[in-house]
Amino acid sequence: MNTVNIRPLPGERRVNYSAGWFVPVDEVTGMPPALPLRVFLDIHDGQGWVPTGIEPAITLSGAITYPGLGRCHNPAAAAPTRYRARFESEAYLAVGRAHQDGEEFLAYPFDGTTPPAVAASRVTVSLAPAVGYPFPGHLPVLYGQVSTAAGEPVPDVLVSATVGPPVLRTPQTAQTLTGPGGAFALPLRWAPAGPAITVTATDYRHVPNRTGQLSVQLPGALGRNQQIVIR
């Protein structure tokens, strides 16, 4: 159970439970994000999502939490509340956006003596690099755009490339997401020069899913803006 102690009165100890527990990870570095990341919390009012304006608490390890969500006077008579955390940044794109706008979770009712019926689960939020990410100079990055056959740019499309045997003994996969204008930046740190690499774009938000592929070779493909059409 994730707990956070906040401002107890003298001689008292007040325990709060965190309904949300998110650990953001920069997929380029494998570390907590070093660049600015904004988090917005929405509540579902039965009709749709409404911004709450509630700011998260950040733990010493960099986890994003929402202590106090679900606290009420009579937990036995209260129902869980549905929330959603959205992650936005100029440098990052939350990979989960390939499927939905944010990470949804339930805040179960609790008070000072009754804990939530269900403990919060730790959720890793993978942050793929956006086009504006400051990549190190030695890292090969494939830039491009995903669009429909009609030329309309498509945001929130998962772009990935996998290379395995016989080129690489252990299969490696790189992934990123398209931004609002359909543009993407796909880092390929393990990709060898010469062999063809297949880059796949998948729009999971469209029903049915739309996909497109592109075959590239390094290093020649790095100096061009690649175009992937999904159908």
Question: What kind of region is each of these model predictions?
Answer:
Residues 75-96, 193-206:
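A short, solvent-exposed beta-strand micro-motif common in secreted/extracellular proteins
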Residues 91-123, 203-227:
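Structured interaction patches on ligand/partner-binding surfaces of diverse proteins
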